[in-house]
From Swiss-Prot:
Pathway: Cofactor biosynthesis; (R)-pantothenate biosynthesis; (R)-pantothenate from (R)-pantoate and beta-alanine: step 1/1
Protein name: Pantothenate synthetase
Residue positions binding (R)-pantoate: Q57, Q150
NCBIfam families per the UniProt record, alphabetical: cyt_tran_rel, panC
Binding site for ATP: 26-33, 144-147, 173, 181-184
Segment forming the signal sequence: none
Record's keyword terms, sorted: ATP-binding, Cytoplasm, Ligase, Nucleotide-binding, Pantothenate biosynthesis
GO biological process: pantothenate biosynthetic process
Natural source organism: Albidiferax ferrireducens (strain ATCC BAA-621 / DSM 15236 / T118)
GO cellular component: cytosol
Reactions listed under catalytic activity: (R)-pantoate + beta-alanine + ATP = (R)-pantothenate + AMP + diphosphate + H(+)
Function: Catalyzes the condensation of pantoate with beta-alanine in an ATP-dependent reaction via a pantoyl-adenylate intermediate.
GO function term, MF aspect, one: pantoate-beta-alanine ligase activity
Length: 282
């Protein structure tokens, strides 16, 4: 595996290839990341991963400074997963001057759910992904569906800017008890880790209610919030949305959406000091 630190060296090295496959990460890799790499490997003639903790997508009170950085373990894991090129720029390389030009996703997608609770998050994500795409120039890019809204934002960006990149979403990998794999799971205490599965279980209960005929989305979401709060969580949202646009479905379209696999349930909640997200397609 070749490790590259500069954009110039990356472009020079990749000039020998025609179909790069790309998996961007922030490091602290787990089996979920490695599953993305394995999916990406046969899709191109060179497999590129990046490690870059992107300051633009963190709010001032969030965990940019404490986000786990596990360089040696990450390099070993990437090599074992078949990565050919690791692009690991420093902040000065990717942002040599203030990033005053930014990608602004539409408010109806970027200012709801995660975007409501993390203002500016999707501007930061879109901007760094656009910049990484410009550096790598992949033919295919692979992302996890755990970050469901992020995947939709990136797909929309690629479509509207006519980027010649196929964006592939890969199903969320889960622990044996159902907890979605996440770098932030490392923050959990043993007691919190045992409790953490209840976020995915809350979404499963919502799905069960929808399949049983529930059409009152507001009441469904409110009850799920109450139930999770009673367990000691601080939920930001537990939401049922249309898969197509992440908007709230009208009561008279819920049944048809459930029947035609047209809904997604999304949740974000804090247990202790750790904020977790998850989703479930219905």
């Amino acid at each position: 595996m070749k490790i590259v630190r500069t954009i110039a060296e990356l472009r020079q090295h990749l000039s020998a290839y025609k179909h790069p496959a790309f998996v961007p990460t922030m490091g602290n890799l787990h089996e979920g990341h490695l599953s993305l790499l394995r999916q990406a490997k046969p899709l191109g003639d060179v497999l590129v991963a990046s490690i870059f903790v992107n300051r633009l997508q963190f709010l001032p009170h969030e965990d940019f400074d404490t986000y786990p950085r596990t360089w040696e373990a990450d390099c070993q894991a990437l090599q074992a997963a078949g990565c050919d090129v690791l692009f690991a720029p420093g902040e000065q390389e990717l942002y040599p001057e203030p990033q005053t030009y930014r990608v602004q996703p539409p408010a109806e997608l970027a200012d709801i759910l995660e975007g409501h609770f993390r203002p500016g998050f999707f501007v930061g994500v879109s901007t760094v992904v656009m910049k990484l795409f410009a550096c790598v120039q992949p033919r295919v890019a692979v992302f996890g569906q755990k970050d469901y809204q992020q995947l939709m934002v990136i797909r929309g960006m690629v479509r509207q800017f006519a980027l010649p990149i196929a964006v592939l979403g890969v199903a969320t990998l889960r622990a044996a008890d159902g907890l979605a794999l996440s770098s932030r799971n490392n923050y959990l205490t043993p007691l919190e880790r045992a409790e953490a599965v209840h976020l995915s279980q809350s979404l499963q209960q919502m799905a069960k209610a929808l399949r049983a005929g529930t059409v009152d989305i507001a009441a469904l979401e409110q009850q799920a919030m109450v139930d999770l709060t009673a367990r000691g969580w601080q939920p930001d949202y537990l939401a049922a949305r249309r898969r197509a646009d992440l908007q709230v479905p009208a009561a008279d379209e819920v049944a048809a959406l459930v029947q035609n696999d047209g809904l997604v349930l999304l949740g974000a909640a804090r247990i202790g000091n750790t904020r977790l997200i998850d989703n479930l397609e219905v």
